[in-house]
């Protein structure tokens, strides 16, 4: 059965561990190590989930949540809290520090667990498959929902957070905003674009969102950079058509390149939308030109084409 061979269930009961394969059945490429363990997620005790929720709330005020404040929030006895925190730390869902005081912090794996547990509870997804892609700020997984779906986990890096907060206007400019919450903001931004563009532009269909995780439809084909096109001119024209339709709908991608255009050789899809800006933005012309220049440069290098940037800009921005 597909579910038994390719996916690990996120909620009990689980009869045996799924068969492991070194090859992903979707991409036919070696499976990357899975940072998310479905067995850990579905085995979380209700007290451990309560602790994760409390840390999530309190990390909006604290970088390290004081132990006394956490105990008061979760209403567990000191021995019970110590035992449950030990489990969470052992599973790498929570970290602790003793300087300048005893405190605890949620890490990405714990944030993953909360989001996936909630999505499973809503029956948006029922099982987790292999990792099928990884980017600078995201991880992509297969999952089972009503059929095979894609999970995009936004992972804004801790090191790059300050740079992102400066360069991306949707990031909060003041107050305490750890990178896990910046990742949720990035996901919200992309989900907003997918919802608005769905049915107008060739993009993945948004299904659900929870924290930093977007559930979307599976897109056939592969990233443009992995393809050898029989008819590059037709695909280039399709890309311009989709960019033009997005522009007319009020969206400039903001990070368009051969890495976030997908094609099956006949149809194209534009993916990865967290950095979009509206055509009314003060930098809209420069951002649009950069997007189109990336595409034109890629086609020129790989297929020796000679597309004109000014013609592309005029086509996309035509009334």
Regions found by a protein language model. Give the residues of each.
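C-lobe/activation-segment region of protein kinase-like
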Residues: 248, 265-319
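Short, hydrophobic-biased segments on the C-terminal half of alpha helices
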Residues: 82-86, 243
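Short, cationic-aromatic polyanion-contact patches
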Residues: 41-48, 99-118
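Short amphipathic alpha-helical interface segments
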Residues: 45-73
């Amino acid at each position: 059965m597909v579910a038994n061979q390719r996916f690990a269930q996120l909620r009990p009961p689980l009869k045996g561990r799924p068969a492991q394969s070194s090859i992903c059945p979707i991409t036919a490429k070696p499976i990357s190590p899975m940072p998310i363990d479905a067995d850990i997620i579905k085995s979380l005790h209700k007290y451990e989930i309560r602790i994760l929720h409390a840390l999530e709330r309190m990390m909006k005020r604290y970088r390290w949540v004081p132990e006394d404040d956490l105990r008061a929030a979760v209403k567990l006895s000191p021995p019970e809290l110590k035992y449950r925190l030990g489990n969470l730390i052992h599973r790498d869902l929570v970290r602790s520090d003793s300087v300048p005081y005893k405190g605890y912090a949620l890490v990405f794996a714990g944030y993953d667990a909360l989001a996936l547990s909630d999505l499973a509870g809503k029956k948006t997804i029922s099982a987790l498959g292999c990792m099928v892609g990884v980017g600078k700020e995201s991880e992509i997984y297969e999952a089972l929902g009503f059929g095979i779906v894609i999970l995009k986990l936004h992972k804004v890096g801790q090191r790059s957070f300050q740079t992102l907060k400066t360069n991306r206007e949707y990031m909060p400019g003041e107050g305490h905003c750890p990178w896990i919450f910046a990742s949720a903001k990035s996901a919200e931004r992309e989900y907003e674009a997918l919802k608005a563009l769905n049915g107008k532009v060739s993009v993945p269909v948004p299904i659900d969102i929870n924290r930093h995780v977007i559930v979307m439809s599976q897109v056939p084909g592969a990233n443009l950079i992995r393809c050898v096109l029989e008819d590059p001119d037709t695909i280039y024209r399709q890309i311009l058509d989709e960019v033009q339709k997005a522009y007319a709908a009020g969206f400039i991608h903001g990070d368009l390149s051969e890495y976030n255009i997908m094609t099956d050789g006949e149809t194209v899809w534009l993916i990865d939308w967290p950095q979009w800006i509206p055509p009314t933005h003060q930098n809209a012309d420069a951002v649009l030109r950069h997007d189109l220049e990336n595409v034109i440069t890629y086609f020129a290098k790989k297929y020796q084409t000679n597309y004109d940037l000014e013609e592309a800009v005029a086509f996309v921005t035509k009334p």
